[in-house]
Amino acid sequence: SIMKAMNKIKRFGAMSLAGMLLMGALAGCGNSSENDSKTDSDSSASGAIDVVSREDGSGTRGAFIELFGIETKDASGNKTDNTTSDAIIANQTEVMMQNVQGDENAIGYASLGSMSDSVKAVKIDGAEATTENVLNGSYKISRPFNVATKSDLSAAAQDFLNYILSADGQKIISDNGYIPVDDKAQAYQAGSASGDVTVAGSSSVTPVMEKLKEAYEGVNKNVKITVQESDSTTGMTSASEGTCDIGMASRELKDSETG
């Protein structure tokens, strides 16, 4: 874990970013006409590609534009997001999936753990989007899941974090298609914590956090966990301001968020 200024940041899992549908994920989110034409010529389909992007503030978007070079940086270090202005904006993972599922010409991006039979993941450099390929390094498009808290964490919130990082919590993360950070974690030891805990942030992290909440409340009925879905930036702001106990981010944290 990392300790910086106001927040404690813990990485509790990782996942792969999967482009959806069988068109070129690399070209899909740029605004280069050369890339767009290459995608069309390399595909058996024809016609315009409907780009679906996550909203500003989304950790998924931030990770995607960085990993694929869609975000550029000038000599002064100023960053520019070159996602095409024609992109359809999906403000949650579920909306992204629905948009891509309902449009055979659409291409978007989501976490591997969110994938379903309704969409198809794009191979990257010939590698399929699987947990095994992320672990062996052949599928290189992956990013961390992080949680952040203020230093003065309640006993109930700390106990829930302990559960997430225990062997029990890490198994839930693995069972749901994500990459655990500690395959040698110790079993969860139930304590006497009680109270309410609010977890807020990334819609990509929310599904697995809901699974962790359900399992934790099954072994500790004295703690009530509320999971609020928004985006990574909102989650980090809420944790910093103390309006939630634990913030969720599906990307690396920015310097401005860690102190």
Report residues per predicted region.
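Intrinsic low-complexity, intrinsically disordered segments enriched in polar/basic residues
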Residues: I2-K4, S41
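C-terminal motif of bacterial Sec signal peptides marking the signal peptidase cleavage site
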Residues: G24-G28
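Bacterial N-terminal signal peptides that target proteins for export
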Residues: K4-S16
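Exported/periplasmic ABC-transporter solute-binding proteins
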Residues: G30-G259
